[in-house]
């Protein structure tokens, strides 16, 4: 579904990504781990066209997207849940969700299904997002991404700043995507939580892929896990 082949990405004249390659299959959950500054968020930004790579190829659903604009990539079926949620604070929850609605060739979600996943949402619809807690904002951000009918969702630090109960709900939602045939690429500092839901894992270091393998292998091998990600 998603292929990233040997991309090089720069901020100005500073190179940040040095040829990482990865893939995410249809309905597959893939974790992308690594220390702060390893290049994980830049890789997501490259996929989304926000920081386009200078070389290499990115393809989605069989089509090259390396040179496409971000809005075109979204219309093709890639959703994004950024680390800062990026809800519109002065707009209501209902309006924020309405802005996410799109139809693609992938599964189309309904608002009632979002209420089934995040039950508090139904009672927050009239509230402005600036009055929400961090956990409530994350519910809005994830729901908005799903209402865009993606075949793939990119999650950037989905558990950041959330209470443990909300983290469980978020990870349960990511796991559910697999059952719905939706793929996910999950950047996450909470490595154990990510490994619990992922099928495969990549570990980045200094803009390169340092490790690739089944998530269960890294989860069960404490020595390797400590060496690669320090947990």
Regions found by a protein language model. Give the residues of each.
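Catalytic Walker B motif of ABC-type/P-loop ATPase nucleotide-binding domains
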Residues: 153-157
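ABC ATPase C-loop
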Residues: 145-146
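Conserved structural motif at the start of ABC-family nucleotide-binding domains
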Residues: 2, 17-19
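The feature captures the beta-strand-to-loop junction immediately N-terminal to the Walker
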Residues: 33-35
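Conserved ABC ATPase signature
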Residues: 128-132, 136
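Conserved ABC transporter NBD signature motif
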Residues: 56-65, 76, 109-110
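Helix-to-loop junction immediately C-terminal to a conserved catalytic motif
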Residues: 48
